[in-house]
C-alpha cells in the first residue's frame, strides 16, 4: 500500500504535468509523437481523443493491439507533412535521439501542429545512451538546456530526480546502497519541479497562443 505522506511529498512527473494541462478543460484532442507502444495520454481517454504517431510500423501495430490510442499515424515527423492540429502535442523522451539541428526542426514542426499546448520531456543536458534493446534509435545524439526552451517561450520544470545522483537511463549514478533513496531526499530538498537546474529531466511546456491581453482587449479606435 502506498505511503500517504510519501505520495503527498512526491514531486510531480511528466504525467502529472500532462494531467494538469488536461484539467484545464481545454484539451479535447492530443497527439503523442514517437508514441511507441504505450502512452501517458491513454489515461485521459475517452474525454480526450488521442492520436499516436510513430515512424515504425511494428510500434503502431502493437499499440493498436493494446488499444493505446483512438487514432494512429505512421509517419516520419521530420519529413511527412500532417494536415491537422491538436489541442495538445506531447513528446516524451524523443528529441534527445535526434541531432541538434533535427531537434530544432522538430520543435518548429510541433509548434505548427499544436493549437494550444506542447509538452515535452528530455534529459537535462547531454546524457550518453547507446543502442539499448538492440535498437539503434535508442542512442542519444543531443543534449538540451533550460535556456534553449525558455528562449522559445516554454516554461521549464524539473522531473525524475537530480542530475547529481541519476545517471545512465536515469538509474543511480553511483554504486552504493541507498543511492536512489538519497536522491529522493535531495529531490525534495532542492525542489526540482520549481528549480529545474538541479533535475535529471526537463519538462518544457508552451502555450502556442502566447500571453493574452491583460488591459486593453478591444482594438484601438
What annotation goes with each model-predicted range?
Residues 1-90, 104-107, 139, 160, ...:
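Conserved N-terminal segment of class I S-adenosyl-L-methionine
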Residues 115-123:
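Conserved beta-strand signature within the Rossmann-like core of class I S-adenosyl-L-methionine
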Residues 129-147:
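Acceptor-substrate binding/catalytic loop of class I
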